[in-house]
């Protein structure tokens, strides 16, 4: 789990991997039990998938985040430092600290492929945050070096039809701004320093 923070996790697929790689007979039920023990010990938190357009929860897979990134890094002997995943986990922890419920968003978009056929694409919103009547859709992006990368990060946000705030939190010190589509871009330091940064 420590090496796959921010990744969709399915106990059945994990059990299959254990069976194939380790020749273990561990079941998905046992893995799910272990995951719930890690949650009960406040080592991991589970973030459920939420179908934004269908307004319902999707049972599996879910994402797990470490409550303490220091413990996660120590478990991996400080070797596996993927900044993108660490930043996503850090944002998750800060959102939870601010009292929000945090889910992983799923939105379907229909588009044309190279042959002109309609194809449905499943897009992910890193965080769907709720607090009372307020909601925010948040993407975590370590860097946005090209317009292509910007378009990739905001594709899921563009596919959401409601008027709740849509935000991309970036690494580095880029200035806060709002684009012509109403999507806010906010750097990680400004996000962490100001408890009201999502409401600017």
Residue ranges of model-derived segments:
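A cross-kingdom feature that marks ATP-driven nucleic-acid transaction machinery
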Residues: 29-200
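Conserved helicase/translocase motor-coupling segment
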Residues: 1-40, 46
């Amino acid at each position: 789990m420590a090496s796959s923070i921010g990744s969709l996790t399915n106990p059945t697929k994990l059990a299959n991997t254990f069976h194939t790689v380790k020749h273990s007979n561990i079941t998905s039920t046992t893995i799910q039990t272990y995951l719930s023990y890690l949650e009960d010990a406040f080592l991991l938190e589970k973030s459920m998938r939420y179908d934004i357009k269908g307004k319902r929860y999707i049972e599996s897979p879910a994402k797990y985040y470490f409550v303490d990134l220091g413990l996660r890094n120590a478990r991996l002997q400080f070797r596996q430092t993927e900044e993108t995943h660490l930043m996503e986990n850090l944002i998750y922890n800060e959102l939870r600290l601010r009292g929000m419920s945090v889910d992983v968003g799923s939105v379907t978009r229909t588009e044309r492929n190279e042959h002109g056929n309609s194809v449905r694409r499943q897009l992910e919103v890193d965080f769907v945050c709720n607090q009372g009547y307020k909601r925010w859709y948040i993407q975590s992006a370590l860097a946005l070096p090209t317009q292509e990368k910007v378009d990739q990060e905001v594709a899921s946000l563009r596919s959401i039809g409601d008027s709740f705030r849509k935000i991309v939190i970036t690494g580095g010190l880029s200035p806060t701004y709002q684009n012509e589509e109403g999507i806010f871009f906010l750097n990680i330091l400004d996000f962490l320093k100001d408890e009201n940064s999502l409401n600017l």
